[in-house]
Amino acid sequence: MMELETGQCTIMELKKENVKELAQVFKTVAFKDTGTWHASEAGMKITVDDGSYQLASVFINPAFFSSFKVREEIVSMKISIKSISEFLSISENSSSSVKVSYPGMFQPVKMLVEDADGWVARGNFTTTLADQELDFEFDDAGVLATYLLKTQVLKEIIKDFDDTSRTVRIQFTKNSLCFTTFGDVGETTVSIPSRSLQMESVKCLEEVEFSYLLSLIQRMTTAFILATKLILRVDERGVLSCQFSIDHGEGNASYIEFLTVPADEEE
């Protein structure tokens, strides 16, 4: 039987009372098998990238957990984010809790999920040294347009995108945010006016348009479903930043950011 080490023999020890919330957060970025897990006294960060076009990061504050102990300045490891997401999703019961234990470098991360009825699941996840992460060099000083909006309308727009379209073109203007697909049924455009109740603020220094692979935008579907607000930005190179805020109640929130490079129209 696997037991979880506790105390000074571990460098990271976490507990979350509602495992479903943690499972949902991991699921938002589990589009590739492995990713990097960072932890410090400031919180936890999970980063996943596809090696070329997209990088996603989850930021979780210590207050999200019922217990959060990190005994080194920074803990970093490469680990299977997808396997952890699947393991945490075993229990859909909000009364289930999870304990996490990590002894240190090259040791496995151990997880113990328990519910009020005594049901228990144990997970053991291999770790290796963290890889160097992609850096899209997103420059805040080079941002051309910023939109703060509620996610409800975008959930519906993304759900209705034409799957036969290779790309989605996004037009960033002062008056609206426009999405256009080019599929078997032809060209389809949906716009969110700046005066819409879904749009809280708009800052557009220059009106531009860029195209992105539809498959990359669809990777954000879970984040769109869970989040209540989104800050959408684009820089002068067309790198798209989507920053999602997930409200967990009682003042607790987690944040997800997707950075996506524009598609090469000549491909």
Curated annotation (Swiss-Prot):
The keyword Nuclease applies. It is an enzyme of class 3 (hydrolase). It is found in: Nucleus. Gene3D superfamilies: 3.70.10.10. Its main location: nucleus. Disruption phenotype: RNAi-mediated knockdown disrupts hus-1 localization to the nucleus. GO terms for biological process: DNA damage checkpoint signaling; DNA repair; intrinsic apoptotic signaling pathway in response to DNA damage; nucleotide-excision repair; telomere maintenance; telomere maintenance via telomerase. Probable component of the toroidal 9-1-1 (RAD9-RAD1-HUS1) complex, composed of hpr-9, mrt-2 and hus-1. Interacts with hus-1. Might associate with hpr-9. May be a component of the 9-1-1 cell-cycle checkpoint response complex that plays a major role in DNA repair. Promotes DNA double strand break-induced cell cycle arrest and apoptosis, thereby playing a role in genome stability. Also required for telomere length maintenance and germline immortality. May possess 3'->5' double stranded DNA exonuclease activity. This is Cell cycle checkpoint protein RAD1 homolog mrt-2.
